[in-house]
């Protein structure tokens, strides 16, 4: 931080409000301190945390870059999920069909897909309809069963479109297709991150339902499409930087936000029972603090669902309260988006004393 300037500690209700608070503080810094978007870095412990931040930035028209990874909606597992949803809304979407017909793996190879393409052209049928008659293509046994299962899932959820809202439909779909089970049961480290991203995607759908209680799947897909299209209009160089704390090593920015400062998230739960791992997390927190040339914002939420359960974090990170009290200025924030109050009036920051309770 600048000489004598305290670190801002911002309390929010949940991750939606946390992202909204970042946008609010960032816009205030730009207006009052005449900063550029490129002056800011938003740091987080795990990649899946970027989703709520990206959504808030896109809605506010704030350009950003992801360092050391893909933007949330460009990650393969998320594109696969959106492919499923697009196919359910429009079963004639052959591009989405080819993308997801063997996701999760169900033994449908490219040769089988090619047979379906040829059969659809020959019979002048939609490709999705061909899946229901595998015997006409000489496909039998497990592959025939897999094609029929996939066809029945798409047909079932297409017929459920008028009956279920987006949240209900998406949650039922990821369970029935086995997407959640596939990633959760995998021992590969990259699949654990993909599982976290899928669960974060579901949280994004839940947030859409809060904003749009009667919203259907088509409306949700329109919003995702609109938000991702906005990226193409942004200045390539003047962008906010989003990245994990690990990716931030060696970089410096005038203003740094460290988000998700709750025990169990930062430090991670897996580090709480090991002195060595906890010390490594503490060093990572120090790395985050020292990325800032002028100003640091420390962010935490009172409620944040853990991946794969309804359990909440909510305990402020021990790293925050290991810092000298006179170096912190606690700021409660109330989101204009949710209208939830955590001290203060909607849409403003309210300074309060730091308490060690």
Sequence positions of predicted segments:
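Helicase P-loop NTPase motor core
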Residues: 1-63, 86-90, 122, 144, ...
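C-terminal accessory regions
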Residues: 260-357
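Accessory C-terminal helicase-associated subdomains
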Residues: 39, 59-62, 104, 130-247, ...
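A polyampholytic, Gly/Pro-enriched intrinsically disordered region
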Residues: 17, 83-105, 340-356
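Conserved helicase core region in the C-terminal RecA-like lobe
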Residues: 46, 99-106, 219-268, 280-304, ...
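Conserved short internal alpha-helix adjacent to the catalytic or cofactor-binding core
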Residues: 5, 58-65, 70-104
